[in-house]
């Protein structure tokens, strides 16, 4: 279902967008130890410099930096970078999960699921004509693998600080920068060269729904669990549709089956009507 698939993608990306936005708004991401000099004590710095350097930097950049109230702690610990790296890894992992789904759902065309068709971007093989590989999702998968590795690097670098200083900020900054750039390019590539051209293989999807035994779950509220189990066993044994067996047994009318086994209703987020939800709430 195109609408359902789009909603799923938006939900996943939206969650990560919220996480990154929350991270951006967190005060510690804008804290600076500037003015603390060597180890955060402010040695050899004038009070005028210590008091004015951060406000002047904020004015010059337009970024609302604030000076840490504990310059020693901010100099010793670089955990704020770890929070950013973790959020970046979470976003990459979510995108990689989407790409895993795309690769699996597009597998085929004969022996896989074949529920969706990805745009062909290059010849898949020099020895097998017609072979098409999901190269764009694979690219984003590999970007995610690299970003997860970067996060491990950042974690170890943050942990490796000793006493008043952390000497490993160069690899922290390089890992974060590389990860941010790669993820930005990966998202653009996935969107432009894959997602915009994805189409549903409607015939395959329709056939899979019709032959699925799992749809018997939608009949449980109407015919009961035991009767539904019996239908499932019969459908598996005879390789016949669940709906036809239910109709033959007189368990449901054809109209009831059309309503209960409607793919759109079964895949919607909640099949309860607003009035039913209100009624349930009223009984609680």
Over which residues does each language-model region extend?
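Conserved beta-strand signature within the Rossmann-like core of class I S-adenosyl-L-methionine
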Residues: 2-13
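Short Gly/Pro-enriched loop/turn and capping motifs at secondary-structure junctions
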Residues: 14-15, 237
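C-terminal substrate-binding/active-site "lid" region of AdoMet-derived donor-dependent transferases
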Residues: 16-23
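Conserved, well-structured ligand/cofactor-binding cores
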Residues: 21, 28-284
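N-terminal functional modules and adjacent low-complexity/disordered segments of proteins
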Residues: 4, 25-27
């Amino acid at each position: 279902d195109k609408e359902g698939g789009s909603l799923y993608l938006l939900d996943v990306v939206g969650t990560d967008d919220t996480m990154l936005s929350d991270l951006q708004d967190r005060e510690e991401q804008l804290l600076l130890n500037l003015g603390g000099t060597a180890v955060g004590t402010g040695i050899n710095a004038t009070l005028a410099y210590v008091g004015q350097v951060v406000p002047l930097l904020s004015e010059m950049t337009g970024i609302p930096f604030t000076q840490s109230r504990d310059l020693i702690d901010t100099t010793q610990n670089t955990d704020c970078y770890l929070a950013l790296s973790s959020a970046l890894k979470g976003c990459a992992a979510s995108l990689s999960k989407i790409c895993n789904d795309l690769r699996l759902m597009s597998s085929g065309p004969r022996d896989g699921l074949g529920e969706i068709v990805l745009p062909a971007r290059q010849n898949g093989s020099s020895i097998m004509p017609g072979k098409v590989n999901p190269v764009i999702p694979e690219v984003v998968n590999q970007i995610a693998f690299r970003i997860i590795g970067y996060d491990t690097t950042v974690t170890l670098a943050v942990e490796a600080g000793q006493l008043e200083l952390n000497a490993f900020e160069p690899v922290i900054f390089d890992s974060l920068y590389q990860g941010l750039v790669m993820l930005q390019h990966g998202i653009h590539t996935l969107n432009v060269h894959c997602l915009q051209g994805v189409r549903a293989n409607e015939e395959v999807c329709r056939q899979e729904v019709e032959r699925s035994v799992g749809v018997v779950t939608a009949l449980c509220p109407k015919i009961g669990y035991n009767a539904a189990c019996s239908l499932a066993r019969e459908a598996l044994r005879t390789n016949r549709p669940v709906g036809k067996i239910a109709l033959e047994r007189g368990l449901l009318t054809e109209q009831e089956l059309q309503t209960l086994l409607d793919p759109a209703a079964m895949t919607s987020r909640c099949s309860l009507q607003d009035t039913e939800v209100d009624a349930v709430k009223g009984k609680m």
